[in-house]
């Protein structure tokens, strides 16, 4: 006979329970394990990488944002426990990001073995480069809106979960920095390009690498550029909606107002190319309002892997 448990749930030692945030990270680690499983079809593995990335974005926008609010609003032991939980989350996410990068490299190698090539701008043949430059001029350049970083001008509100390029330019007047959104919602993240003359299969290049290949054209007539490099980054904002209680607005009007305010909500995570120069990273960190102890996560060259789900 099973004895009933005496006492209330509130009386149990909280150390017996795993915080729901860490439990959720364990679940997403399981998704990443599926992406690493070589018995799973390679296209499905790629989609698991996309699911992992999308899940992590939502985790920061909702769960981590909630913990940050708790740290801000609470005091004493409750605040300290929230700070310790946030530190644990940051450590686990950094580990997961490293594992993600390793798994992604293996999946890309397997795609190549099956004659599906995703190349970058450094691997383009002369014929492919000509195609990419023409594609850029017709479809990509009109959709780009570069923003110069200047101490005199405030940076406009950037869209969370969008992919951006941070640009480091060497000019005769000194270093110049800019950011621009990668317009994958307009053009698509994967661009199909011609194969090599003797190659088989399909060849794609990421839209961000199309922009990298043609970077000097973006600023032609603005700067005399000696060299330029671009580094991916993205960030997540607090997803909480604050609904005003005014009786003079309809629910739809209240929701619309709340969604507009969310565009200016606190940023809760910043993921960036680990090779980004320190000066450029510091500029972005300050302008996006991140402290040094916040969730700044170095990663690989490419981000927004949830778009892998839509690989043609």
Task: Label every PLM stretch briefly.
Residues 2-312:
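N-terminal non-catalytic structural scaffold regions of very large proteins
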């Amino acid at each position: 006979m099973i004895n009933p448990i005496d006492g209330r749930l509130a009386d149990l030692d909280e150390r017996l329970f795993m915080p729901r945030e860490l439990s959720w990270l364990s679940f997403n680690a399981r998704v990443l394990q599926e992406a690493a499983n070589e018995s799973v079809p390679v296209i499905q593995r790629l989609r698991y990488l996309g699911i992992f990335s999308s899940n992590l974005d939502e985790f920061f926008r909702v769960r981590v944002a909630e913990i940050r609010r708790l740290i801000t609003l609470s005091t004493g032991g409750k605040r300290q426990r929230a700070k310790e939980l946030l530190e644990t989350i940051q450590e686990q996410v950094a580990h997961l990001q490293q594992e993600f990068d390793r798994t992604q490299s293996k999946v890309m190698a397997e795609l190549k073995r099956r004659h599906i090539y995703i190349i970058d701008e450094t691997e383009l043949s002369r014929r492919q480069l000509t195609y990419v430059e023409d594609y850029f001029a017709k479809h990509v350049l009109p959709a780009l809106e570069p923003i110069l970083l200047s101490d005199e001008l405030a940076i406009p509100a950037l869209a969370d979960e969008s992919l951006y390029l941070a640009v480091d330019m060497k000019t005769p007047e000194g270093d110049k920095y800019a950011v621009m959104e990668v317009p994958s919602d307009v053009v698509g993240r994967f661009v199909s390009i011609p194969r090599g003359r003797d190659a088989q299969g399909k060849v794609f290049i990421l839209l961000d690498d199309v922009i990298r290949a043609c970077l000097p054209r973006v600023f032609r007539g603005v700067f005399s550029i000696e060299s330029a490099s671009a580094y991916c980054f993205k960030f997540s904002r607090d997803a909480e909606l604050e609904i005003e209680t005014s009786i003079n607005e309809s629910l739809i009007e209240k929701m619309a107002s709340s969604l507009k305010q969310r565009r200016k909500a606190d940023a809760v995570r910043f993921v960036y190319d680990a090779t980004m120069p320190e000066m450029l990273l510091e500029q972005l960190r300050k302008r996006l309002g991140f402290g040094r102890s916040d969730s700044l996560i170095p990663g690989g060259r490419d981000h927004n892997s949830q778009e892998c789900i839509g690989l043609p």
